């Protein structure tokens, strides 16, 4: 695929598939390594002991099943198997076996953490993984092309809706419209409160920054009308998510959302084809 910014272009399906497989594997791999690193906190004496969390499950049979699954040695084995499946995704591509295992194991991990360990990144991880699952099962019952089309559109609709809703919610909140919310959030960042002379303590600058985010998020669906717009949108989104990582330490937030970008660019290209 050659890029000519003066002419509309499309992202080929094989390239979009390969990019998403590799980006998702990187994203989920980082998450899995984090879980392995946190094993001491998940044992019986740890902060996230299963003995406490199991009380959220009322069904005795389900409790017994998860007691076995979330035993330290078994859960560790599950995480290593998850890394192996992600490696196979990079080396051999998506197939019914590795994607289904990754989806089911991801649900188990979410149950272990009461639904979401890291908020939005877990949501987007599940969205991309669900898209991959759709691609394989639709491909199994129908055909591969239809499966990947359904995958990309599912991920894109979920992603664009998330951006738009986030912007719309900010638009309705007075603290975002007047810029104070940005200062409040940054004061709670990992680098500590903004110092007294920091530029973002100036009301006009924090208001400008807030409105920039609001307008960008609300305009997200417009990126689908041209592949070039989609690429620019994804570049801006990558910068935004990197800043979230930089200020708040949410590293998996960056990779989880970047993994959805190939689907967005691909879908924009399909709209270009339909419009031509």
Where are these regions (language model features)?
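Alpha-helical membrane-anchoring segments
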Residues: 1-276
